[in-house]
Regions:
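Bacterial N-terminal signal peptides that target proteins for export
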Residues: 1-8
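Sec/Tat signal peptide C-region and signal peptidase I cleavage site
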Residues: 16-22
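A residue-level marker of the well-folded mature domains of exported/periplasmic proteins
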Residues: 22-329
Length: 329
């Protein structure tokens, strides 16, 4: 009985020691635009993998963000709260880049601040140490290249964007327009190289999958002769059932390539949509890699080590000639 009691005491002591160790860990925070977006869950999985491989580290990776991707003010408040509470470093994917930068400027934190997935506007980049994520301008370039192969003579096009103030989305749109027009600094396609944006476009999803699918349906109805629909981000495809219903209405056009769809990202529902013929090309980011690499980048910054700026995580391009990443993922 005595030995059993001693064993219980030892187990309790071990648990308390483990809890104390967890409490003493320093926090590396990753704040995303919204927990409702499956893209960001991949960043979380990368963060969790880092945790599983670094159990003895003095640091822990914390993934957080507002419940909804539409809650820009909520994201700013979360960053504010974390900096007030005290974290060792923070990586932010700003939904509203100017608003987030303004708050960072006001707080003037002494800890390392970096951006992940989405950057601050160019004028505000001195507020962060580095950016880790996609070369978003290049992503737009790649999407344009796919469109040019599929529609060499050009045509009518609609761009679907996310949040009006999201720097990453705007950079992709710029890369697309510059490349497909053959001109720099094009705000809207009006016949350059045969491409014109239809009335009512671009459309902004505010990162909402249901709205994204409704917008697609409305644009298809209003523009029976539309040549290309470009999902600059994956929003509509994040709701696969709704996306299937929308694309069912134009499946004959998709098969004949009278209408082409090119979409950003390569999450599992999206690669399935591609294999099902519901898009002609996917240009994918690597969010898992972002979440996995971010803690080590933050630790380097804490230690005063030199870190490249930016740190690009690469792209995966899928098309009918080379299914690539989309073939089996």
């Amino acid at each position: 009985m005595k030995s059993k009691f001693i064993l219980i005491l030892a187990s309790a002591a071990a648990l308390m020691a483990g809890a104390a160790e967890a409490q003493n860990k320093k926090t590396l925070a990753i704040v995303v635009k919204g927990l409702d977006n499956p893209f960001f869950e991949q960043i979380n999985l990368g963060c969790q993998k880092w945790m599983s491989e670094n159990k003895d580290s003095e640091y822990e990776c914390l993934y957080t963000g507002p419940a909804s991707s539409t809650d820009e003010a909520g994201e700013v408040q979360i960053v504010d709260d974390l900096l007030t509470r005290g974290v060792a470093a923070i990586a932010i994917s700003p939904s509203n880049a100017p608003a987030m930068a303004n708050r960072i400027r006001q707080i003037n934190p002494s800890i390392p601040v970096m951006t992940i997935d989405a950057d601050f506007l160019e004028a505000d980049r001195g507020l962060r140490k580095t950016y880790l994520g996609t070369d978003n301008y290049l992503m737009g370039v790649k999407m344009a290249e796919q469109a040019m192969v599929l529609k060499p003579k050009g045509g009518s096009v609609c761009l679907q964007l996310g949040n009006v103030a999201a720097d990453n989305i705007n950079a992709r749109a710029a890369g697309f327009r510059d490349t497909i027009s053959g001109e720099k600094g094009v705000d809207r396609l009006n016949g350059q190289s045969g491409w014109s944006e239809v009335e009512g476009c671009p459309v902004y999803t505010n990162d909402q999958a249901d709205l994204a699918n409704q917008q697609m349906a409305d644009i298809f109805t209003a523009n029976a002769d539309l040549d290309a629909f470009i999902l600059i981000g994956g929003w509509a495809q994040f709701a696969p059932q709704a996306y299937a219903q929308v694309t069912d209405q134009v499946m004959d056009k998709l098969k004949s390539k009278d209408l082409i769809i090119i979409a950003g990202d390569t999450l599992p529902p999206q690669t399935q949509a591609f294999r099902d013929g519901r898009s002609h090309s996917q240009v994918g980011q690597r969010p898992f890699e972002m979440g996995y690499l971010a803690p080590d980048v933050m630790i380097k910054l804490i230690n005063g080590e030199t870190v490249d700026d930016p740190l690009f995580t690469g792209l995966d391009v899928c098309n009918e000639q080379d299914k690539g990443f989309c073939a089996n993922n």
